[in-house]
Regions:
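Charged, low-complexity, helix-prone segments enriched in Lys/Glu/Asp/Gln
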Residues: 17, 21-40, 109, 151-163
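Serine/threonine-rich low-complexity intrinsically disordered regions
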Residues: 3, 15-17, 35, 41, ...
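Terminal amphipathic helices with adjacent charged low-complexity linkers/tails
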Residues: 1-25
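Thiamine diphosphate
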Residues: 1-8, 66, 76-176
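Alpha-helix C-cap/termination motif
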Residues: 14, 59-62, 112, 140
Length: 176
């Protein structure tokens, strides 16, 4: 409890140390975003994942939306770029979970916040596992929006299942 009290007092004190840290983070983020801006604004065809995220961030009513992502690549792609501008507007979570987790998460968010626009990002691999969750959203009258990032790949984490990757191309979703 004492530690929490000290943290609260420090946060409320408008400490110059905290201001310096915030300024330093802002400078680093600005430089980092400069490197990524070409991807977020790219006109390449097909659209890259970062362009989709960049367009959503520019057009979405951030204060009246709740956004999440699915496991794997979509999480890694959106996490650095989505600005959570108000509490509970972005539901981010740990390293990974099962594919298809974003849709039920958004169903719950929509039922709890019916006036909010609820948006889920997921990959094409996860979308293929989510038919019953879409039916649940319809049945429960929980209108959500899902953006499917059609990148034709899954199992994006390097290092796992090397033989299956090399021999069978298990990360490629080609329909073959």
């Amino acid at each position: 409890l004492l530690t929490l009290q000290v943290m609260i007092e420090l946060a409320q004190s408008k400490s110059p140390v905290l201001s310096d840290i915030a300024r330093e983070i802002s400078v680093i983020k600005e430089a980092w975003m400069e490197d990524w801006t070409p991807f977020l604004n790219s006109d390449e065809i097909p659209l890259n994942t970062y362009r989709v995220i960049g367009d959503i961030v520019k057009t979405l009513d951030l204060e009246n939306s709740i956004v999440t992502h699915d496991a794997g690549g979509p999480r890694d792609s959106i996490l650095p770029f989505y600005p959570a501008t108000v509490p509970n507007s972005y539901i981010g979570w740990g390293k990974t979970t099962h594919l298809g987790f974003g849709i039920p998460l958004m169903i719950g968010a929509k039922l709890a916040n019916p006036d909010k626009f609820c948006l889920n990002f997921m990959g094409d691999g996860a979308f293929g596992m989510s038919g019953l969750d879409i039916e649940t959203a319809v049945r429960e009258k929980a209108p959500i929006t899902t953006i499917v990032l059609n990148n034709g790949g899954m199992a994006t984490y390097p290092g796992g299942m090397l033989t299956a990757r090399d021999r069978y191309g298990m990360t490629k979703m080609t329909g073959d």
